[in-house]
């Protein structure tokens, strides 16, 4: 079984390992032997990777697994782990051995990377970026025939805030002040409460902001972070890299991945009894990998819990635009805290946003920010110092973050086309989510909670005992065994639930809803045929 190599989760994993006798797979371990039913090309692939691993192990180079930072060995990131590595090799082999496989393409359902799967960027955003990057176009008469008037106006305004009017220049370490002003205004419009641009730190996506906060809060294994299980593995990985302890709390699958305050209290008390100083609570809303959207009442309970226990609330809100059901609505934790009357001196709150998700999906542009509230001035100086070490985030990402929080408004030249693009993407995501949800729930032994938000489904698979035993023989987790077999048979890439964490003895996988609509029927057909064949092969 893949384990969370975090001290506080270790006991849970050891319990599960005693039940199932699995070892944690490693990307440096030799690949498992191909299944008897594997095509010859797959056999060649596994053979070549095993030989490569063996030659690596005899290297006399000065850097070895024994000499590198052990914290690096402790962290894992399943979203781009072993199965994805296999898929990438298969994709290369398909170019020259297309007839050797039972599929003609690899379909990546493993990661929230919309544009890699055919989603088009928002035209207004790209027009503004193009004009900012090639500012001389603004002086050309032809530009007014090629670009919308509001994208031209926005580009002028943005360039006025950039040092030297050049996107290749460094900026302030927190990000360009004029762009932070725009983002603060967008937050204020969203929440109905004031936002201060000096609280905003622009980063290369949300991930560096998470790392920055872990670096700030964790000094040893005696410092812990309450993190959900299942969780986005950025959190377990960053906690490991920065030397802290992950304190897991389990989301309740039976109630649609609900967050129970009673479980938070139990895990907090248990950690404290072991001498761990729990510093913060991570909440992902909408959920990744689980796709739930928290009710506002639940959020109030969470805020009150953090206030009472003196915990920093780390609010991962990068999917705030991705809500697909009419009975749920996104509410920021800052809005909830302010609605309860908690101000700067009452609760420490860090909220994360990214240009990679939502309806924009600009993953490669690496834009995002964190809004840091409820910290003393001397601590804020230390946060700024950490930001300064990295000089600044990239300017294109900064511009996109400002555009995401201040898109075209009614009356703007681009407004109608922007709304058509936005609504089209979100409605299509909702349709794809429902189609995949229904398909998964139709499979034998599979249950999938409602897709309320984010970009993922996290179905539970009840595997036959013979399949679990076959996985044990290959020294891999049963859900990873299932996902490898799925990849080898169909070319569809999903991520085992063991990479996100799950209740011991349960098995899941994460599947994105991002392949375009014309690909969904093929995914459903491939998955349905594979699952039936798999269950028939291993039926008890």
Swiss-Prot record:
It is found in: Mitochondrion. One of its GO terms (biological process) is response to hypoxia. The keyword Metal-binding does not apply. The N-terminus is blocked. It catalyses: L-alanine + 2-oxoglutarate = pyruvate + L-glutamate. Pathway: Photosynthesis; C4 acid pathway; Amino-acid degradation; L-alanine degradation via transaminase pathway; pyruvate from L-alanine: step 1/1. Residues 1-46 form a transit peptide. CDD domains: AAT_like. Keywords: Aminotransferase, Mitochondrion, Pyridoxal phosphate, Transferase, Transit peptide. The keyword Transit peptide applies. InterPro entries: ALAT1/2-like, Aminotransferase_I/II_large, PyrdxlP-dep_Trfase, PyrdxlP-dep_Trfase_major, PyrdxlP-dep_Trfase_small. The modification N6-(pyridoxal phosphate)lysine is found at residue 357. GO terms for cellular component: mitochondrion. Expressed in shoots, essentially in leaves and flowers, mostly in vascular tissues. Also detected in stems and roots. Its main location: mitochondrion. GO terms for molecular function: L-alanine:2-oxoglutarate aminotransferase activity; pyridoxal phosphate binding. Homodimer. Belongs to the class-I pyridoxal-phosphate-dependent aminotransferase family. Alanine aminotransferase subfamily. PANTHER family: ALANINE AMINOTRANSFERASE, ALANINE TRANSAMINASE. This is Alanine aminotransferase 2, mitochondrial. It comes from Arabidopsis thaliana (Mouse-ear cress). The gene is ALAAT2.
